[in-house]
Amino acid sequence: MMYRSLIILLTATALACNNPMSKKSASDDKSNKKVEELKHNKIYELPADLEEISGISFLNDSIVASIEDENGILYFYDLKQNKIVRKLQFADNDDYEDLVIAGKDIYIINSSGLLFQIKDYESEMPVIKSFQTAFRKKNDIEGLAYQPKLNRLLFGVKGHNLDSSRENKQIYAFDLKSMQLDTNSAYKLQLDEIESYFEGDVIEENSKKFLKGLGNQNMSKVFHTSAITVNPITDEIFMLSSLNNLIAVLTPDGQLKKVYALDGKKFKQPEGIAFSADGKLYISNENGGIGSGNIIELNYAN
């Protein structure tokens, strides 16, 4: 009798394991995690001066402030006229990564964490200052964003976090009143959370390249922060990775909300991300050694 009961129990267990409904209930928390592709809406091919375009930030719905990652020149590019309408030399040649407009000022960061402030950038004689932060070359700062409600800048780390952790990519806050950096991270993008978006029975074709990196013990090979921006409508933080062409979206309190993949060959080397005031999302791409750089308006809706 005991032997028969054991057979019935094992059979029931096997049926439960093979029951698709049982599998579904066990993975309900993953079923709503799906990587969505963002396709391009408009593409703006850029002149030779911006072949190595890095960061972008919008003055208005037409004019984009931009930098090139090798020279200390600030470019103002008009999307409607398809031309550079102004140039401003702010520093010598260096490795400049991102910029952001904050009120009447523009801030630019280099990879070693040197922050430039261009005060009253619209004036004929803007004042330029620089601030050395706690970051160094090994941190490889590539993202810079502005949170107006908190009056602070955000720095996105591509390389080493300040606490040397490898399981996440951190964002740090710089207070614009005190002009001081908080060395404790403001946000953390957990890399295993990114990985969880690619688990399941069906793996999208564009994620296969990404999944090859998951076997690496160093999880930083999964996602490299190349730019960050703040959605002016939702206050969400958008983190761009040129590695695997991904965008991770964090809620204002730092929770991973969404992962997007960039679709199309025009995303040669995505290095900049920005919203226009009306909530349109744009990506800037270096030329990748072929052709011209570009700015792409994405088919994205808040």
How should these model regions be labeled?
Residues T13-A16:
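C-terminal motif of bacterial Sec signal peptides marking the signal peptidase cleavage site
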Residues M2-L9:
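Sec-dependent signal peptide recognition
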Residues N18-N302:
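Sequence/structural signature of beta-propeller domains
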